[in-house]
């Protein structure tokens, strides 16, 4: 579909890039009580902060709830966009060459195609695994960095604690470097995201499919 997404020919309206979901942003909000570290605005629910989670498992539980909250908001936004497409921008010429639209008497934007898929892209899987691994090892297991210290360092972008940044860079395991439990953290949350998304049906009556983007999305979403 124009770039890297796969689709079938002549029978599918595959909105393959319906949304991009920034996993690390959800983790940032988990650590900071729902407050955006860039703007200072509260944009997510407050399930606690890094200073209040007594265990790594408690942090993961809060992160899981943040995912639920923002996935639901994302789906609502996708539905509004799809409704606008159907109402304001129907595509009769495209519908004429897509299987089942003529038979159903429905435009592709209204769900007339044989298949009606929407793709949601997970962004920052590797960065999420790195972040989770650093939290687990250095904050909770080995206690080399206190929760309060790391939270303050994050809130000030490490300007006042370069040593904390150095410890994170050099002492935390990294995704994709044959550290099995770190790679498993990435796989765990990618699977969790996919399962959460599978609960929803898109506006055209089809399924949401989960993808992963790298390169073009990691840099702007990490800024």
Predicted regions and their residues:
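Conserved catalytic cores of very large enzyme subunits
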Residues: 1-126, 130-223
């Amino acid at each position: 579909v124009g770039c890297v997404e796969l689709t079938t020919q002549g029978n599918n309206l595959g909105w393959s890039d319906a949304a991009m979901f920034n996993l690390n942003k959800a983790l940032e909000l988990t650590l900071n009580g729902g407050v955006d570290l860039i703007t200072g605005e509260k944009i997510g629910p407050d399930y606690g902060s890094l200073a209040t989670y007594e265990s790594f498992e408690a942090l993961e539980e809060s992160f899981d709830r943040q995912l639920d909250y923002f996935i639901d908001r994302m789906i609502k936004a996708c539905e509004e966009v799809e409704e606008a497409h159907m109402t304001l921008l129907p595509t009769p010429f495209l519908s004429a060459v897509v299987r089942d639209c003529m038979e159903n008497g429905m435009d592709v934007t209204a769900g007339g195609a044989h298949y009606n898929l929407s793709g949601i892209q997970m962004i920052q899987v590797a960065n999420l695994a790195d972040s989770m691994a650093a939290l687990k090892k250095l904050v909770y297991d080995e206690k080399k960095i206190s929760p309060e210290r790391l939270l303050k360092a994050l809130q000030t972008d490490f300007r006042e604690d370069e040593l904390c940044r150095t410890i994170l860079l050099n002492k935390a395991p990294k995704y994709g470097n044959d550290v099995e439990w770190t790679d498993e953290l990435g796989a765990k949350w990618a699977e969790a995201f996919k399962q959460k998304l599978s609960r929803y049906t898109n506006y055209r009556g089809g399924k949401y499919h989960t993808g992963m983007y790298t390169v073009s999305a990691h840099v702007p979403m990490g800024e």
